[in-house]
Amino acid sequence: MNAMLETPELPAVFDGVKLAAVAAVLYVIVRCLNLKSPTAPPDLYFQDSGLSRFLLKSCPLLTKEYIPPLIWGKSGHIQTALYGKMGRVRSPHPYGHRKFITMSDGATSTFDLFEPLAEHCVGDDITMVICPGIANHSEKQYIRTFVDYAQKNGYRCAVLNHLGALPNIELTSPRMFTYGCTWEFGAMVNYIKRTYPQTQLVVVGFSLGGNIVCKYLGETQANQEKVLCCVSVCQGYSALRAQETFMQWDQCRRFYNFLMADNMKKIILSHRQALFGDHVKKPQSLEDTDLSRLYTATSLMQIDDNVMRKFHGYNSLKEYYEEESCMRYLHRIYVPLMLVNAADDPLVHESLLTIPKSLSEKRENVMFVLPLHGGHLGFFEGSVLFPEPLTWMDKLVVEYANAICQWERNKSQCSDTEQMEAELE
C-alpha cells in the first residue's frame, strides 16, 4: 500500500534532475560563450596631444561600442577558431600581380601587388605594405577581405608572402620565414619605394607580422622614411616573455601551441629537401639539425630551438627570442603607431599587454587600443548568429590610416600657409 502511494512522486524527482541538468548546461553555455560580458568601446591608452585628439575626433570606431555577434561573438575562443578555420565569410577575390625578388642568399621572396580601386580621400598616392600572420600569405581569406576593403578606399596594397608559406612556391635556398626576420619585408618596401617614388606608406602587420613590421621600422631610422604610420594587430611583443605563458593550459594556450606547431611542422617538412637535403649547401648551424626531434615536437618553442633559430645562427633559444622580438625596437619608432589587441585573445597572455600600455604612456605617437572582445584576429561583427564579411578590425585599420593621411595633409597645408605669411612679411 505504501509503495503504491510513493510511485507518483518518482516523476517529480526525475523532473527535478532534468531541470538541474538543463540549468547546468545553460550555465556552461553562458560561461563558455561569455554571454554576461558587456559590450563597450575599446579601452584606449595614449598621451594627450594634438594627434590623439584629432584621432578621437576622426575615428568613430575608437569611441563607439564594438558589438560582436550576440550568441558567440563574446567568446575569444570561438572568434579565434572561426578566424583560424574560415578566415572570413564571403571573402572577395581581389586581383593582383605576383612579384618575385631574389635575395642575396639565393632565396626567392614573393609578394602580391594590388592597385587601388578608387581615389584616396586625400587624393594622394598611398600604399599599404602588409605583413600577414605566422605561415600566412596573400591568399588567406582575412588578407583578401582586408585588401579588397583597402583598395576600395583608395590604397594600393603590397602583401608579403612569408618565405615557404605558399604551397606552390619552392624554396630556392636553405632558409624560410622566422619570427622576426625583416629581410623579405624590407625588400618588398624597397621595391615599392623604387617603383612608386611618389607614394607614401602605411605599414600594417597582423600577429607575427606585427612583430616583423615594428622591428623593421625600429631597426634603422631610414626604414621610417616615407612612412605615414604603422598599425600592429594581435601581436605578443616579446617571444621571450610569451614562452612560459604558451606552455600553460590557461585559456587553452597549450592546445593552440600544439596546433600551430603541427602546422609549422607540415610546412617545414614540405620543404625538407630544400632545407636539409644532402645536395643543399646549408649553413653550418643547420648541419646538426635532428629531424627526429622535429617530428616529435609538440610546441613552437621546440621547433624554434631545433630549427628556426639556426637559420640565422643564434646560439640559443633565449638569444633568438631576445634579438627577434620587436619589444627592444618599439621605442625607436617615431611615426604614428597604433597597437591593437583583444582582451580575450587566448594566444596573448594579459601580462604581455603591459608592453604596449607602458609604451603608450611614454610616447605621444603611440595609441594602444584594447577591445573586450575579438579573440585572435577575429573581430567579427554581426547581429545574432551570422557574421558580416567585413570585420571591426578591417574598418578600424583603414579608418586610422585615413585619419593619419588627413592629419599629414593638414600639417602640410599649415606649413605652406606659414611659409607664405613669412614671405609676405
From Swiss-Prot:
Coiled-coil regions, chain positions: none
GO terms, biological process: acrosome reaction; acylglycerol catabolic process; negative regulation of smooth muscle cell migration; response to progesterone; response to wounding; smooth muscle cell migration; sperm capacitation; steroid hormone receptor signaling pathway
Domain AB hydrolase-1 as annotated: residue spans: 128-382
GO molecular function, one term: hormone binding
Keyword field contains Cell wall biogenesis/degradation: no
Expressed in which tissues: Widely expressed with higher expression in testis. Expressed by vascular smooth muscle cells, non vascular smooth muscle cells and heart.
Xref: Pfam families: Abhydrolase_1 (PF00561)
Residues of this chain annotated as glycosylated in UniProt: N136, N410
Domain of life (superkingdom): Eukaryota
Cytoplasmic membrane side: 1-9
Extracellular topological intervals: 31-425
EC number from the UniProt entry: 3.1.1.23, 3.1.1.6, 3.1.1.79
Gene3D superfamilies according to UniProt: alpha/beta hydrolase (3.40.50.1820)
Swiss-Prot/TrEMBL keywords: Cell membrane, Cytoplasmic vesicle, Glycoprotein, Hydrolase, Lipid degradation, Lipid metabolism, Membrane, Serine esterase, Signal-anchor, Transmembrane, Transmembrane helix
GO cellular-component term (any): sperm plasma membrane
Compartments where located: Cell membrane; Cytoplasmic vesicle, Secretory vesicle, Acrosome membrane
Top enzyme class: hydrolase
Regulation of protein activity: Acylglycerol lipase activity is activated upon binding to progesterone.
Keyword Hydrolase: yes
Annotated PANTHER family: ABHYDROLASE DOMAIN-CONTAINING PROTEIN, MONOACYLGLYCEROL LIPASE ABHD2
Reported function: Progesterone-dependent acylglycerol lipase that catalyzes hydrolysis of endocannabinoid arachidonoylglycerol (AG) from cell membrane. Acts as a progesterone receptor: progesterone-binding activates the acylglycerol lipase activity, mediating degradation of 1-arachidonoylglycerol (1AG) and 2-arachidonoylglycerol (2AG) to glycerol and arachidonic acid (AA). Also displays an ester hydrolase activity against acetyl ester, butanoate ester and hexadecanoate ester.
Family: Belongs to the AB hydrolase superfamily. AB hydrolase 4 family.
Protein name: Monoacylglycerol lipase ABHD2
Organism listed in the record: Mus musculus (Mouse)
Name of the coding gene: Abhd2
